[in-house]
Amino acid sequence: MAKNTYKQDEILEEPFDIRHLLRASSYIKKYQKRMIIAILLSSLGGAFGYIAPMITQHALDVAIPDKNFRLLFSLVIALLALYTGSIIFVTIRSKIMVEVSQNIIYDIRKDLFEHLQKLPFQYYDDRPHGKILIRVVNYVNSVSDMLSNGLINIVLESFNLLFIVIFMFLVDVQLALVVLCGVPILTVFMIWIKNKQRKAWQAVSNKNSNLNAYLQENIVGARITQIFAREDENAQIFQDLSQDCRRTWNTAVRYSNLVWPGIDAISVCVRAAIFLFGLVIFGEGNKSLGTIVAISSYASFFWQPIMNLGNIFNNFINNIAYLERIFETMDEPVTVSDKENAKEMPTIRGEVTFDHVAFSYDETKKVLKDVSFTVKPGESGALVGPTGAGKSSIVKLVSRSLNVDSGPEVVDGQDISEVTIHSLRSQMGIMMQDSFIFSGTIGDNIRYGKLTASEDEIRKASRIVCADDFISRMPEGYDTEVRERGSMLSQGQKQLISFARTLLSDPSILILDEATSSIDVQTEKALQTGLNAMLQGRTSFIIAHRLSTIRGCDRIMYIDDGGIMETGSHEELMAKKGYYYKLYTAQLEEVHKTA
């Protein structure tokens, strides 16, 4: 798919898809008992409140005219008891729903994060990370309330509406029908505003996502911004994105704000009709004052759940766009996964074979075409060639970070597509060009390669890769705290820490993808000595820009145009005076010029 940038809006789904809500219901099922209890408590609390107008009617029509103060006192006590019970039930219900809401947040966020962990590298390459973050954090928070309190309130307010209608008809049928005359008008109004609201809130979702993506990108690239004095230009872009957010928000709120005045206007008209109609009939002696007051109270109650449902409707429209984005992420295909009956990979000896392997990222262009080679256990295989030739794709296929289009990849005679990914990768050490450092201590970053490693094991791995010297000079040594992405470390130091982390995992197959590109020549020489000892007995694949670092490899493969152009040791390839010879001599001449 095409790459998505901070300037690019994500595609909006035109029709509302009820399947989103049906799918979301799976997160509610495990809490349905607690939600039913919450509904019952709320319904009881609401019913208590709706009995109050009937008590008021009895007080106005019987207790006060008859000056029956004992009855009046009893009615007042009954009112207080009803309101107290209602408050208690609603409080308990609120406590239950807070717990349910937080549990739903946890469940959705856990599933979303676990799925993100399985997505291919290309997914993260094609999207601003800020757009991914906002889905996991902000969007999940927003939809959780809709899935818990929102759904419960729909049921609750529907029950409330039913109770009110029943009580109205018990008090007076004619005046109850007057109240219901406003319902068709309200229905037409809500249908009209529905689609406009949904599109408006989807636009808000897009613009907020764009702003978040740009902000995250600029926080990471703050140093580059200052180096190139781009503060003013970036501030203008941020202002433009913020104005887009403000514009779409104002449009969405304008539609949302129409709901309340619309319902309120209908409510006022209906209540006016009750008094006009009721007073005419009352004048004829057919209706009591208590009846009119009771119906007026119920009319007020009647529109309250409708207004609440309107508010819930607004929130649903707002959050459906977020729910779509969450499920869109969950539906991203995991391109590399275990087969149904995948086996555990036995202990790896290290023979790796590609048998006429072909691979492409899409159907338009083959990255690798008919690639075949065998690296024996304990051998070191180097991949060299121009940028974009397919070197990194080969090592990603070895670790099964990608799937081949055709041709088996075999490790120790076992097709790696038939084994579990975890059992395969847990026996491999992979060191990429981009050395990522997590926030925490230096020791914790190294221990990431083997969570059970002792301090001695961590130091041993660090010494082998020449990282121990600079770590020991840090303020707290291995306990020195490093910030996100290792901002306080040089690029070379970050790579040395990553080397120690990789070697600590004690891999059977070691993959180094431009792993020494950011290390100075002097450090690289010292590191090479340690690596040579570490590579003994391990199969290794090495991609290196500086060809001097791979001279000692058992097998050097020159990759170009998706295939292996030539293979052999350094001496053999130099004797051929082919592709490798030309690349090596050109690089050697460049070194002499800069010396």
Where are these regions (language model features)?
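An intracellular "coupling" helix at the cytosolic face of ABC transporter transmembrane type-1 domains
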Residues: K33, F121-Q122, N138-L147, L151, ...
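ABC-type nucleotide-binding domain
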Residues: D338-K339, M345-A595
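Hydrophobic alpha-helical transmembrane segments of ABC transporter permease domains
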Residues: L40, F48, A52, I77, ...
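Membrane-integrated ABC transporters
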Residues: M1-G49, I64-L75, R93-M97, S101, ...
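Short intracellular "coupling" helices and adjacent cytoplasmic loop segments at the cytosolic face
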Residues: K3-E14, Q102, K110-V140, A213-I237, ...
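Transmembrane helix-loop-helix hairpins at lipid-water interfaces of multipass membrane proteins
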Residues: M35-F89, I96, F169-Q174, G285-L289
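Juxtamembrane loop-to-helix connectors within ABC transporter transmembrane domains
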Residues: R19-H20, I28, R93, M97-S101, ...
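Helix-loop-helix
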Residues: I64-L75, F167-C181, T251, Y255-E324, ...
